[in-house]
A protein has these predicted regions:
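A short acidic, glycine-rich active-site loop
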Residues: 53-64
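Structural beta-alpha unit
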Residues: 73-105
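Active-site phosphate/pyrophosphate- and oxyanion-stabilizing loops and adjacent acidic/basic residues
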Residues: 20-23, 70, 125
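Gly/Ser-rich helix-loop-strand patches that form or flank binding pockets
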Residues: 4, 96-141
Length: 141
Protein backbone atom coordinates (compact mmCIF):
# COMPACT_ATOMS: atom_id res chain seq x y z
CA UNK A 1 0.00 0.00 0.00
CA UNK A 2 1.30 3.44 -0.94
CA UNK A 3 1.06 5.56 2.21
CA UNK A 4 2.93 8.68 1.06
CA UNK A 5 3.25 9.92 -2.51
CA UNK A 6 5.31 12.97 -3.44
CA UNK A 7 4.06 14.60 -6.66
CA UNK A 8 6.70 16.95 -8.11
CA UNK A 9 5.17 19.56 -10.42
CA UNK A 10 6.97 22.24 -12.41
CA UNK A 11 4.17 24.57 -13.50
CA UNK A 12 4.18 23.55 -17.17
CA UNK A 13 1.59 21.77 -19.28
CA UNK A 14 3.32 18.52 -18.25
CA UNK A 15 1.93 19.05 -14.73
CA UNK A 16 -1.58 18.37 -16.07
CA UNK A 17 -0.39 15.03 -17.47
CA UNK A 18 1.19 14.13 -14.11
CA UNK A 19 -2.12 14.92 -12.37
CA UNK A 20 -3.97 12.71 -14.90
CA UNK A 21 -1.65 9.81 -14.09
CA UNK A 22 -2.13 10.39 -10.35
CA UNK A 23 -5.89 10.21 -10.93
CA UNK A 24 -5.46 6.84 -12.66
CA UNK A 25 -3.81 5.28 -9.61
CA UNK A 26 -5.93 3.32 -7.18
CA UNK A 27 -5.21 4.94 -3.83
CA UNK A 28 -6.33 3.90 -0.36
CA UNK A 29 -8.05 6.28 2.04
CA UNK A 30 -4.85 6.27 4.15
CA UNK A 31 -2.67 7.55 1.31
CA UNK A 32 -1.28 11.06 1.73
CA UNK A 33 -0.31 13.09 -1.34
CA UNK A 34 2.31 15.84 -1.08
CA UNK A 35 2.33 18.22 -4.06
CA UNK A 36 5.66 19.99 -4.37
CA UNK A 37 7.15 22.67 -6.56
CA UNK A 38 10.79 23.70 -6.47
CA UNK A 39 11.68 27.26 -7.43
CA UNK A 40 15.20 27.00 -8.88
CA UNK A 41 17.90 29.12 -7.29
CA UNK A 42 19.53 31.69 -9.61
CA UNK A 43 22.60 29.42 -9.93
CA UNK A 44 20.56 26.38 -10.97
CA UNK A 45 18.51 28.47 -13.41
CA UNK A 46 21.69 29.20 -15.37
CA UNK A 47 21.85 25.52 -16.26
CA UNK A 48 18.11 25.15 -16.78
CA UNK A 49 17.16 21.61 -17.77
CA UNK A 50 14.16 20.14 -19.54
CA UNK A 51 12.47 19.25 -16.28
CA UNK A 52 12.49 22.81 -14.96
CA UNK A 53 10.35 25.83 -15.84
CA UNK A 54 11.31 27.63 -19.03
CA UNK A 55 13.34 30.84 -18.63
CA UNK A 56 10.77 32.74 -20.69
CA UNK A 57 8.18 32.16 -17.95
CA UNK A 58 9.55 34.01 -14.91
CA UNK A 59 5.95 34.90 -14.08
CA UNK A 60 5.62 31.55 -12.32
CA UNK A 61 5.13 33.43 -9.10
CA UNK A 62 4.88 31.79 -5.72
CA UNK A 63 1.22 32.84 -5.50
CA UNK A 64 0.37 31.42 -8.94
CA UNK A 65 2.03 28.08 -8.21
CA UNK A 66 0.40 27.86 -4.79
CA UNK A 67 -3.07 28.47 -6.31
CA UNK A 68 -2.42 25.84 -8.99
CA UNK A 69 -1.39 23.23 -6.40
CA UNK A 70 -4.40 24.10 -4.23
CA UNK A 71 -6.65 23.49 -7.25
CA UNK A 72 -5.11 20.02 -7.66
CA UNK A 73 -5.57 19.43 -3.93
CA UNK A 74 -9.29 20.23 -4.16
CA UNK A 75 -9.76 17.47 -6.76
CA UNK A 76 -8.53 14.83 -4.30
CA UNK A 77 -10.72 12.97 -1.86
CA UNK A 78 -7.72 11.97 0.28
CA UNK A 79 -5.34 13.81 2.62
CA UNK A 80 -2.83 16.08 0.91
CA UNK A 81 -0.28 18.80 1.56
CA UNK A 82 1.65 21.40 -0.43
CA UNK A 83 5.40 22.10 -0.27
CA UNK A 84 6.86 25.11 -2.08
CA UNK A 85 10.64 25.23 -1.75
CA UNK A 86 13.64 26.92 -3.37
CA UNK A 87 16.81 25.12 -4.39
CA UNK A 88 18.28 22.62 -6.81
CA UNK A 89 15.14 20.79 -8.08
CA UNK A 90 16.37 17.18 -7.96
CA UNK A 91 18.03 17.64 -4.55
CA UNK A 92 14.92 19.28 -3.07
CA UNK A 93 12.56 16.63 -4.46
CA UNK A 94 14.71 13.88 -2.92
CA UNK A 95 14.97 15.80 0.37
CA UNK A 96 11.16 16.19 0.56
CA UNK A 97 10.67 12.51 -0.32
CA UNK A 98 12.92 11.57 2.60
CA UNK A 99 11.18 13.97 5.01
CA UNK A 100 7.73 12.61 4.12
CA UNK A 101 9.00 8.99 3.91
CA UNK A 102 7.56 8.77 0.40
CA UNK A 103 6.78 5.32 -0.99
CA UNK A 104 6.55 6.81 -4.47
CA UNK A 105 7.64 9.97 -6.28
CA UNK A 106 5.68 11.01 -9.38
CA UNK A 107 7.59 13.37 -11.67
CA UNK A 108 7.28 14.54 -15.27
CA UNK A 109 9.91 14.27 -18.00
CA UNK A 110 9.97 16.20 -21.24
CA UNK A 111 12.32 13.66 -22.77
CA UNK A 112 15.36 15.67 -23.79
CA UNK A 113 17.73 13.64 -25.90
CA UNK A 114 21.22 13.91 -27.33
CA UNK A 115 23.40 16.92 -26.70
CA UNK A 116 20.67 18.97 -24.96
CA UNK A 117 20.30 16.24 -22.34
CA UNK A 118 24.07 16.00 -21.85
CA UNK A 119 24.50 19.77 -21.51
CA UNK A 120 21.34 20.58 -19.54
CA UNK A 121 20.91 17.41 -17.52
CA UNK A 122 17.63 15.92 -16.36
CA UNK A 123 15.92 16.38 -13.03
CA UNK A 124 13.84 13.21 -13.47
CA UNK A 125 16.93 11.09 -14.27
CA UNK A 126 18.73 12.38 -11.19
CA UNK A 127 15.68 11.72 -9.00
CA UNK A 128 15.37 8.15 -10.38
CA UNK A 129 19.04 7.49 -9.62
CA UNK A 130 19.20 9.03 -6.16
CA UNK A 131 15.76 8.50 -4.58
CA UNK A 132 15.29 5.94 -1.81
CA UNK A 133 11.86 4.96 -3.14
CA UNK A 134 10.21 4.07 -6.43
CA UNK A 135 9.81 6.83 -9.01
CA UNK A 136 7.05 7.04 -11.61
CA UNK A 137 8.25 9.16 -14.53
CA UNK A 138 5.39 10.60 -16.60
CA UNK A 139 6.18 11.29 -20.26
CA UNK A 140 4.61 14.23 -22.06
CA UNK A 141 2.80 11.98 -24.56
Amino acid sequence: VLKNILVALDGTELAERVIQVLGDLVLSAETKIVFCHVFPTPESELELSADRPHPESPTLSYFHVEKQLQAYQEKLSIQSAIELVTGEPADEIIRLANIYKADLIIIGSRGLTGMKRIVQGSVSSQVVEEANCSVLVVKSK
